[in-house]
Amino acid sequence: MAAAAEESGWRRVGFVGAGRMAEAIAQGLIQAGKVEAEHVLASAPSDRNLCRFRAMGCQTTHSNLEVLHSCSLVFFATKPHILPAVLVEVAPAVTAEHILVSVAAGVSLSTLEKLLPPMARVLRVSPNLPCIVQEGAMVMARGCCAGSYEAQLLRSLLEACGQCEEVPEAQVDVHTGLSGSGVAFVCAFSEALAEGAIKMGMPSGLAHRIAAQTLLGTAKVLLQKGQHPAQLRTDVCTPGGTTIYGLHVLEQGGLRATAMSAVEAATCRARELSRNPSPVVAQVPSVLQALQGEGALAHREHSSVARS
C-alpha cells in the first residue's frame, strides 16, 4: 500500500469533519486496503465523532490546519453551512500539491473555488451512507484546476466504497436527491414492507430481515442483468396473482408520484443550498485575496516538509 501511495503522489488521507459520511468513506478505504488506518488523519471540534476514527486505528486532531499540513488528499466532510468558514480557515495552508474533495451537499464548485487559492485542485463528491459497507452509490465532478489525473485517482479510491461515476456538476444535486437522501427513502419503504408482514402475523425481526434481503436481492438482479425495473416487475406479475393485486394498491396510494416528488424535493433543497451559500462567502473579499496570495505560498514549503 505504501508503494502505491508513493506512486500516486499522496501519502496520507485527511478528513476535515468526522461525521457519519467521513467515517463511511474512511472505513471503506481502509477495509478495501486503499489506505492504512494509521495514514488517515481526521479533525473535529470535539471527541464525540473522533472516537470512532480512533477505534478504526486512525489518527485524530482538533486542528483543521494540521490535517492540511499533514495530508495532500483531504476530504471536507463538515455540515454545508459550516464548510465556507472552514475553507477560509485552512486556505493559508492550501498548496498546489493538495487534492481537495468536498462531500458537503449543496456547496457548489464555484463556492469552493471562491474560498480557496486560485491553484487549488478541487473536486466535489456526492456519496451515500452505504459506502460504509462498500456498496455506496457516488458521483463526482471536477473543479477548473482538477484534471483527469485527480479524477482518476479519486474514482479509483472511491470505487473501494462502491460505485463512483463522474458527471457534470449539474447532476450532483440530483444525485443527492436520488441516492444521498434516497437511503432514507428506501429505509422507509423497507420498514413499511416489514410492518405489512407484521400486521399479517409475521414476527418483527424476521419481517425486517426478509424485507431488507428482498431489496438487496432485487437491486442485485437489476444491476447484474442490466434490466429496466419495469421488465423485472412484469416478470414477477402473473395474471390474477398476488403481485398485481398488491401493485394495484400501491398505484391507488400514489407510490410512484410520491417517490418522484420526494426525489424532486430533496434535489430542490440541494439546489437551494447551492444558490444560497453561507454569508461567510460574502464576508471575506480582501482577507481571502491575501490568503490566496502570499499566505498560501508561504505555507507551501511547510506543507511539503510536513508530508515528507
UniProtKB/Swiss-Prot annotation:
Keywords: Amino-acid biosynthesis, Cytoplasm, NADP, Oxidoreductase, Proline biosynthesis
Pathway(s) where this gene product acts: Amino-acid biosynthesis; L-proline biosynthesis; L-proline from L-glutamate 5-semialdehyde: step 1/1
Enzyme Commission number(s) from the entry: 1.5.1.2
Major enzyme class: oxidoreductase
Gene Ontology cellular component terms for the protein in this record: cytosol
Catalytic activity line of the entry: L-proline + NADP(+) = (S)-1-pyrroline-5-carboxylate + NADPH + 2 H(+); L-proline + NAD(+) = (S)-1-pyrroline-5-carboxylate + NADH + 2 H(+)
InterPro entries linked: 6-PGluconate_DH-like_C_sf, NAD(P)-bd_dom_sf, P5C_Rdtase_cat_N, P5CR-like_CS, P5CR_dimer, Pyrroline-COOH_reductase
Gene Ontology biological-process entries: L-proline biosynthetic process
A GO MF label: pyrroline-5-carboxylate reductase activity
Disulfide bonds: none
Location in the cell: Cytoplasm
Quaternary structure, from the entry: Homodecamer; composed of 5 homodimers.
Function of the molecule: Oxidoreductase that catalyzes the last step in proline biosynthesis, which corresponds to the reduction of pyrroline-5-carboxylate (P5C) to L-proline using NAD(P)H. Proline is synthesized from either glutamate or ornithine; both are converted to P5C, and then to proline via pyrroline-5-carboxylate reductases (PYCRs). PYCR3 is exclusively linked to the biosynthesis of proline from ornithine.
HAMAP family with a match to the protein in the record: P5C_reductase
Family statement: Belongs to the pyrroline-5-carboxylate reductase family.
Protein name, UniProt field: Pyrroline-5-carboxylate reductase 3
